[in-house]
Amino acid sequence: MTTKIQTVLLTGKTHTTGSRREGAPHGDDRLDLQLSTPGNAGNDIAFTAIQAHPAAEQLFAGAWSACYTGALGLVAKAKKVTLPSDMSVDIEVDLGKTGSAYFIQARIDVRMPGVAHDVAEAIAQAAHDVCPYSKAVHGNIDVATNIVATDAVAA
C-alpha cells in the first residue's frame, strides 16, 4: 500500500535527454551535469574506478545521506539525545547484476562519537522510519546499516 502525500514540501525536477552515456539530467539551473556510465555494465569487464562525472548511484547516495542525516537529528531530538558535531553518515550504493537482472544495494555507516553504541543503533534504526529515502527503498533493496565505533560505553 502506498501513502499519498497531502502537502508537497519540495519538488526536485530534472529533464534527461538520452541515456547516462548520451545525456544529462538538468533542472532549474542549479543542477546541470553529465553523468558517467558505470563502465561497460553489459560485459564482465572491470568498471572504471574514478569517473570524470558523477554516477547516478552517487547522486542517489548523496541525496539519501543528506535526508537520513536529517532524520537522525529528528530522532535524536525526540529521544533527548544530543548528537556530536562530528557525527557522520557514509552511504555506498552498489549497482550490480544477478543473472541478467540489474539491482542496487546499499551500505550505511553511521558514526556518532561519544554516543553509546546501543543508543546510536536505536537512533539509526528509527531514522529509517522517518527518512523518505529509506522508506522508499525498504523491502526493495538490500540495505545494511552499521554503527561505526562510538567510543562510548553502553547506556
Segments predicted by a language model, with ranges:
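Extended beta-strand/beta-hairpin segments
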Residues: M1-A155
